[in-house]
């Protein structure tokens, strides 16, 4: 989401700034997301549910290739969200930085459900001079992120699989995830039918879509530096 800092004369922009840090953080976040997808890919396709064969990508290049679309999906959603804020700032003549992506260490080093990133932020340097501009800038990010997330979620659900509840419970590790807004209709339309005593095992891309819907909804809360705040 956007981070407001500083002030300037409306209609003027800061001089061009170096984007080296933006590029470095982008590469690190893309890499960490691919690695997270590499782990997810192994868990989804393993014969023993949720089993990770190796944490070394060189030992499982096919799984690393499976992690690539995961990383692309994560970056696409984050980029859509932040560019929604950025382009709306430019529309109103307000100076803003390019997105700063926030990478996370590999999941085997820092156990987490986050898909290789803590998100991204832009820095708004200009003064927001009207409530209309403030509202439009705030809402543009979540809308753009949602638009990017829905096709990814739909495809991921179409590739998800159904297993027995017993298989899930005996796998040694499982999480029952909640259903953010739009998950229900998307799951019914794109996902496989889940019968009694069965559960849905999400494809890695379905998890990306699920996570995007959850974070977008949380971002709209009227709290602090969140988009709704």
Where are these regions (language model features)?
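Hydrophobic transmembrane alpha-helices and their immediate loop junctions
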Residues: 1-229
């Amino acid at each position: 989401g956007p981070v407001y800092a500083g002030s300037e004369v409306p209609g003027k922009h800061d001089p061009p700034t170096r984007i080296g840090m933006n590029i470095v953080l982008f590469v690190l976040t893309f890499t960490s997301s691919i690695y997270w997808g590499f782990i997810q890919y192994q868990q989804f396709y393993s014969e023993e549910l949720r089993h990770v064969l190796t944490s070394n990508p060189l030992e499982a290049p096919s799984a690393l290739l499976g992690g690539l679309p995961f990383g692309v999906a994560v970056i696409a959603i984050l980029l859509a969200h932040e560019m929604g804020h950025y382009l709306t700032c430019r529309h109103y003549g307000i100076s803003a930085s390019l997105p700063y992506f926030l990478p996370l260490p590999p999941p085997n080093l820092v156990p987490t459900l986050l898909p290789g990133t803590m998100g991204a932020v832009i820095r708004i340097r200009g003064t927001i001079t009207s409530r209309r501009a403030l509202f439009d800038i705030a809402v543009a990010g979540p809308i753009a992120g949602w638009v990017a997330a829905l096709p990814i979620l739909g495809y991921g659900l179409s590739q998800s699989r159904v297993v027995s509840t017993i298989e899930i419970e005996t796998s040694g590790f499982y999480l029952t995830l909640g259903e953010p807004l739009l998950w229900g209709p998307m799951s019914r339309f794109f996902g496989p039918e889940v019968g009694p005593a069965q559960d849905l095992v999400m494809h890695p891309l379905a998890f990306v879509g699920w996570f995007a819907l959850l974070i977008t909804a949380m971002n709209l809360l009227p709290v602090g530096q969140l988009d709704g705040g």
